[in-house]
Amino acid sequence: MINSFKKLIILISLVIILLSSNNIFIDSFKIPVNQKNVKSSGDSSYQIGAGIYDITGASAEVNLMGYANPLQVGAGIHFRQRARAFVFVDSNGNRAVYVSTDSCMIFQEVKIHVVELLQDIFGPNVYTEANVLLSGTHTHSGPAGFSQYALYGITSLGFYKKNFDTICNGIVQAIVKAHKSVQPANMFTETGELWNTNINRSPFAYDNNPEEEKAMYDSNVDKNMTVLRIEDMNGNPFAAISFFAVHCTSMNNTNHLISGDNKGYASYLWEKQVNGPGTAGKGPFVAAFGQSNEGDVSPNTRGPTCRDGSPCDYKTSTCNGRNEECWSLGPGKDGDMFESTQIIGGNQFNKALELFNNASIQVSGPVQYRHSWVQFTNVSVEPPYNSGVDNATTCRGAMGYSFAAGTTDGPGAFNFVQSDNNTSGNPFWNFIGDFIAKPTPDQIRCQSPKPILLDVGMVEPIPWVPDVMPIQIVTIGQIVLVAVPGEFTTMSGRRLRNSVREIIGESIENPIVLIAGLSNTYSGYIATFEEYQVQRYEGASTVFGPHTLGSYMQEFGKLAQSIVDGTTVPAGPTPRNLTGHTLFFLPPVIVDAAPDFDDFGEVSIDVNLNYSVNETVSCVFYGGNPRNDFMIESSFLSVDLLTGTDQWTTVLDDGDWDTKFKWKMHDLGFSLITIEWVIAPDTTPGTYRITHSGFAKKNPFSSNLTPYQGISRNFVVQ
């Protein structure tokens, strides 16, 4: 075990010099809401509840999860991240819960611990691993450190239990809220196409799929969005769930602020339009924009270009042989990542609202679910799922060379390129890979044509990636949620949906099969057998080898058949418990300091006296390290409006889009907190102030924290 930790430390050191970054900026707009009611039938189809809770982790000094860029360390909050939970109960008392979280993914240990906490509250039979479905939106702008597996904790310097607990507790509290708010309800659904919002970032790999299969579809990405409208017995909507495939990478790897990215922004827009100002993350209306098969799907709709404006190489996504020079830009002006987030999130919101208002297909039928754990390192893949290969099996986990190349959403560094099938590789990186774990001849054959860079499944005594996968299907009437533990590419998702639909259609009329992406654990990417052959990023990150998709189709097919037959499925092997086998190398906050003659909360640079709309208010405070207290269900800032004699009303906080909370460590060792507010055009004229709240650790020999607050001088918005 010690040798494994030494190897991890050495790899961390190498990774810290591996990746590079770039720069980009902001704007904002408002989107009008035009809601209407759809008349419900007289009888309730279900009992449904919805809940929302804060899961925002450390906003300072912790690496952000997603791009694996060690230089992308958190330094504040743009807007908070939430868990949105929906409990469904049918007339027979069968229940299931779907949770969409503003997190990069759901890790195995998160799902297991959430179920443990729920069973502590409700007993062993209400919420189980079988009827709890947890899904991440895949934002790349949330704090990392919440996985116990080494590969996903390298750039975060290990497992940060405080982040892990924040996410788990937030999910549980969202479910508790949903559980307590269950009421007679009806659900309606509608599906439509959303364009100008996603593109395929690996068309070279997609094009390797069979011509007759590609001819079945109008695009190389899924354009369908499906929306679930949930309303009470008076026809008043209180929740919505949308499913649409697009990466949450509108915010690029130069961003250092916590953000829900485009899907989080879409949720924020809808909830705020319905619930009103000053209600970010508070409900009662809850809107989730769930993830789907986004593996090769980018929101950066301008596509990849070289920095000089010339096109990137189609096969390798390089410029003059270097992948660092090939970037995809979003639709914002000059590629502005904040504006791009608004546009892509706004597009999803607008389409979802349109479908929501026109939803006419009533959802009815029982709540059902099946769940199995499957050891995925040696699954025998049988026809028709074996791609015509005899004795097809999955492999122990491995990452290919193109994994290190990154994608056009966030390129890697050095001499790695996509579509690299060169098994001789680079002697230096071969040495590094062999140092971690040297691939065996059987492993090389099994993973072929992938040239193995990191043999993560062969590391002893504990693999660097999970190898026991949760396979889960949840049905709510004709809605079939296929909970996939990873990132399915466009064509992989289509094949899985089609295969499940064909089976489950024997017992469910006109089933609407939806991929719930990045659910219950994370196992990297799932490319088709054909896409795997060209080894772009998605194929190189298909952990269990070329037959990974076939094995998932086979195992999900077993669950679908079980639902048709009304039978149970085996629980499967118990996944590893890595508690006590993790390390975290980021030092704790020892003590906070403030300049001489100043105290925590004192203003360093005050606001101006007068502002107009579209201007940015800025105030700098001396503060404490935000890692002291994450301010869950609270805020590091408030924008307050004077509404009466000495009466202040908070109109914005750090859960809002128009504000930014920024942290910086001063050279002399104290924290500088900058609060920014971009004044929206519809802002009420009046007298305002900026407030900053936090906790300081004044004594290095005590764990006690001291709350503090700072207030700017008053200013006028005209």
Swiss-Prot record:
The keyword Secreted applies. Residues 1-20 form the signal peptide. Coiled coil: none annotated. One of its GO terms (biological process) is sphingosine biosynthetic process. Its main location: secreted. The keyword Hydrolase applies. Glycans are attached at residues 224, 252, 358, 378, 391, 421-422, 577, 610, 614. Keywords: Glycoprotein, Hydrolase, Lipid metabolism, Secreted, Signal, Sphingolipid metabolism. One of its GO terms (molecular function) is N-acylsphingosine amidohydrolase activity. Its EC number is 3.5.1.23. The active site is at 298 (nucleophile). InterPro entries: Ceramidase_alk (IPR006823), NCDase_C_sf (IPR038445), NEUT/ALK_ceramidase_C (IPR031331), NEUT/ALK_ceramidase_N (IPR031329). GO terms for cellular component: extracellular region; membrane. It catalyses: an N-acylsphing-4-enine + H2O = sphing-4-enine + a fatty acid. It is found in: Secreted. Gene3D superfamilies: Neutral/alkaline non-lysosomal ceramidase, C-terminal domain. Hydrolyzes the sphingolipid ceramide into sphingosine and free fatty acid. Belongs to the neutral ceramidase family. This is Neutral ceramidase B.
